[in-house]
Curated annotation (Swiss-Prot):
Residues 127-170 are annotated as: Disordered. Pfam families: p25-alpha (PF05517). Probable regulator of microtubule dynamics required for sperm motility. In contrast to other members of the family, has no microtubule bundling activity. InterPro entries: EF-hand-dom_pair, TPP/p25. Belongs to the TPPP family. This is Tubulin polymerization-promoting protein family member 2.
Length: 170
């Protein structure tokens, strides 16, 4: 059971921290773990309790806690959450709440394609000069589609038959 709790600890410790190795957890991720796993219920254990316990177990000048300190914090929160139970029973209940949990990303925005987005990104519906920027498959033409490329090889500016003069005279 403790190994499952340790896995959950490492998942939450690394959550949102690209530089974190997952061995130490900061206060933000500790609060998230307590909230997502149901340790913090809002009545007997509040966010204030979680912050106070975190501050108690961490070293004086540290900002993070290790798994060992985490276990102490969980014991203390468990005593408050499950009143009247033995410390071992409390620890089992807390580990049971944590089992198999992952950091939830509630409220995170997801990409959606609404009617306007479909209409604006469909290159077959483009008109005017924007139509020239894409080929039939919808792939962009690059700079050739964005700029008017002038061909200065003809006789005069509007001359279309460049390179055909020699063929006509012979």
């Amino acid at each position: 059971m403790a190994s499952e709790a340790e896995k959950t600890f490492h998942r939450f410790a690394a959550f949102g921290e690209s530089s974190s190795s997952g061995t130490e957890m900061n206060n933000k991720n500790f609060s998230k773990l307590c909230k997502d796993c149901g340790i913090m219920d809002g009545k007997t254990v509040t966010s204030t309790d979680v912050d106070i316990v975190f501050s108690k177990v961490k070293a004086k000048n540290a900002r993070t806690i290790t798994f060992q300190q985490f276990k102490e914090a969980v014991k203390e929160l468990g005593q408050k959450r499950f009143k009247g139970k033995s410390p071992d029973e409390v620890l089992e209940n807390i580990y049971g709440l944590m089992e198999g949990k992952d950091p939830a990303t509630t409220g995170a925005t997801k990409a959606t394609t609404v009617g306007a987005v479909d209409r604006l990104t469909d290159t077959s519906k483009y008109t005017g000069t924007h139509k020239e920027r894409f080929d039939e498959s919808g792939k962009g033409k690059g700079i050739a589609g964005r700029e008017e490329m002038t061909d200065n090889t003809g006789y005069v500016s509007g001359y279309k038959g460049s390179g055909t003069y020699d063929k006509k005279t012979k």
